[in-house]
């Protein structure tokens, strides 16, 4: 587990700078542009500004359905896991917001050093360009998981209390569970569920809650495709299911979709096809956990749903800030 650490400058900034924005309805375009500018430099914003930004994000996300309806063209991105400088590399190769429409398939946080900056930047971009930045929920957008895999600890280090973590986890509950592009490409973080035959069944789930330990909502965020598997199998993850080619074919036919696009699993080549190109895994965290040596990928779908993959490597060392190895806060928090 790669625990997040903060540099002294960011810690001081987060605790000392006075906020400039009030309630979410007063969060102006200027405020959002200022937040985006700071976060693009991997600098923290003040705690009160986090609260306001999260409230604004919840307002926007609350208006979106469980299955986000998205028009092409769009660029699909897999797991990011707090690898901020690699997210900057993704935007470099994929194009800046709002020039490019993005759909991120969840797992924004945990394991990487900069989950706070990564998630807040994506939220600020969502608040500023709500129709250009689409975010759905991954299995790591969970209170329980983030207390184990780094995001909670990072919030405590960088802000000195759990308030920012609480604000962010409240946003998690409002994230959509899936998306469908032009009615033909079904997108989800993990995979399918034996409890779900149609997208309409996803649309009626009460998503505004912590990720359950089992059931359809859990399955969407945790399941994996399994080559050679027939029907459904128990997942070694302890949540969700393994689903085979037959389950994928049945779902696609019932919902008139051509492709199931998901993330959730490390792919050394950045993307991987399953089941005669009915299911696709996209992975967007290069050199995962700063040691796996994998490349990353994003998938661009044009107006006709033609596919173009862009492969990219981890950001060069000179482009990334080195987090402090042992911040003094470690001894006191």
From Swiss-Prot:
Subunit structure as annotated in this protein's UniProt entry: Serine/threonine-protein phosphatase 4 (PP4) occurs in different assemblies of the catalytic and one or more regulatory subunits. The regulatory subunits are likely to be ppfr-1, ppfr-2, ppfr-4 and smk-1. Interacts with mei-1.
GO molecular function annotations of the record: metal ion binding; protein serine/threonine phosphatase activity
Query: Gene3D superfamilies recorded for this chain?
Result: 3.60.21.10
| Keywords assigned by UniProt, alphabetized | Cell cycle, Cell division, Cytoplasm, Cytoskeleton, Hydrolase, Manganese, Meiosis, Metal-binding, Methylation, Mitosis, Protein phosphatase
Q: What does this protein's record comment on cofactor binding?
A: Binds 2 manganese ions per subunit.
Q: Which residues form the active site?
A: 140
Q: Which organism is it from?
A: Caenorhabditis briggsae
The identity of this protein, by name, is Serine/threonine-protein phosphatase 4 catalytic subunit 1
